[in-house]
Design a protein with these regions (language model features):
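N-terminal glycine-rich phosphate-binding loop and ensuing alpha1 helix
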Residues: 9-13, 20, 27, 53-123
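Conserved alpha/beta core of the MobA/IspD/sugar-nucleotide pyrophosphorylase nucleotidyltransferase superfamily
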Residues: 13-16, 56-69, 216-297
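Key DNA-contact positions within bacterial/archaeal DNA-binding proteins
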Residues: 32
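A short, conserved structural fragment
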Residues: 42-51
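Conserved beta-loop-beta/alpha segment of the NTase-like Rossmann-fold superfamily
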Residues: 126-196
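Conserved core of the sugar-phosphate nucleotidyltransferase
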Residues: 172-247
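ATP-binding glycine-rich phosphate-binding loop
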Residues: 304-327
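ATP-binding glycine-rich loop module of kinase domains
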Residues: 325-340
């Protein structure tokens, strides 16, 4: 079953009355493609001529029903300078709600209550989640020297029918579902010239070519029952090798000229990855976390508003480093924090 057929089945599980035209709109492909794949599902015995799911289709959906989630929250988010020393990224607030609590709430809405949160930097700040949401915290003590491939390896026994979620995602609608069939990795429809990956018409994630720009990676993923086994084996194997210390977990997905799993393509207006101070300001200029003493010092010294401070970049890598470059009124500056 290909990725488009998987999406058709999941849509029909939620509403068997959907027409092919409605399916095309929901999935984001042409009516002709839906008609072709719909007929393929009929030929495969997964839906009837009348559009009903067969026992085989229902069995497939049941076997791959989401049952748990992993939230990656170990990193210290050095690109969030100057506020990354005060609070871990997952606890930044957007519209009065922390990022990680919104994700947990959205998971609960689709029946996912078994949630593992991999923590490292400022791990104590997340402990309230244990009593409030009954999550399990898993500690990655190597967060300062190794990337999130190693965080995911810590919970490799919990990949089966699991969502993998970065803690710095804000989605206007619920990105999770009660029903899944195939594994997927979330990509945005926004073109990104710096990305090496793009989504083709078959929803495959492939290396971009000279004719096509890449798509933005979002980072949320779903791993079904079938794919959990090989992903676990690859994670554990790569985590044992020092050359993968700086690798993202997505490196495990590569096979040949692209990812081994397909894409879930979303509108860029709906899902936001908050990597920087400016990302946070763009989505919620009233966020309490924007009230940084460092930004206030700059604004007062240059007699400008906070919004005129742009293109903030860390000066050098390092967990304790807070000095950064920034631009203001077409001039570049360095903000050096005393004591460094």
């Amino acid at each position: 079953m290909n990725d488009i057929q998987s999406k058709i089945l999941c849509n029909l599980k939620e509403n068997e009355l959907l027409s092919q035209r409605q399916l095309a709109k929901n999935i984001g492909v042409s009516l002709g493609i839906i008609n072709r794949e719909y007929n393929g599902l009929i030929s495969s015995g997964l839906i009837t001529e009348g559009g009903k799911l067969t026992k085989e289709a229902l069995k497939n959906i049941k076997n791959n029903k989401p049952k748990q989630a992993i939230i990656l929250a170990a990193g210290y988010g050095q690109r969030m300078v100057p506020i990354n020393m005060d609070k871990p990224k997952g606890l930044l607030t957007v519209y009065g709600e922390t990022l990680i609590e919104r994700l947990i709430r959205q998971l609960h809405e689709v029946g996912i209550t078994k949630i593992y949160v991999v923590v490292g930097y400022m791990k104590e700040a997340y402990e309230f989640l244990i009593d409030k949401y009954d999550v399990e915290l898993v500690i990655n003590r190597e967060y300062a020297t190794k990337n999130n491939l190693h965080s995911l390896a810590k919970v490799s026994n919990h990949l089966d029918c699991s969502y993998i979620v970065p803690c710095d995602i804000w989605s206007s609608s619920n990105p999770f579902s009660m029903y899944e069939c195939n594994s997927w990795y979330m990509m945005s429809d926004l073109s990104n010239p710096t990305s090496d990956l793009r989504v083709n018409k078959q929803f495959h994630i492939v290396l971009k070519d000279k004719r096509n720009e890449g798509n933005c990676s979002i980072g949320i993923s779903y791993i079904n029952h079938l794919d959990a086994k090989w992903l676990k084996e690859r994670l554990v194997s790569m985590a044992e090798k020092t050359r993968y210390d700086n690798s993202f977990w997505e490196d495990c997905l590569f096979e040949g000229e692209g990812y081994r799993i397909g894409a879930k393509l979303v509108r860029h207006e709906d899902v936001h990855e908050i990597n920087t101070y400016e990302d946070l300001r763009d989505i919620d200029e009233e966020s309490e976390n924007l009230k940084s003493d460092t930004i206030t010092v700059i604004a007062n010294a240059l007699h400008v508003s906070n919004s005129e401070i742009k293109n903030i970049q860390i000066l050098k890598k390092g967990m304790t480093n807070r000095s950064f470059l920034f631009e203001c009124q077409n001039q570049r500056y360095i903000m050096r924090i005393p004591g460094e």
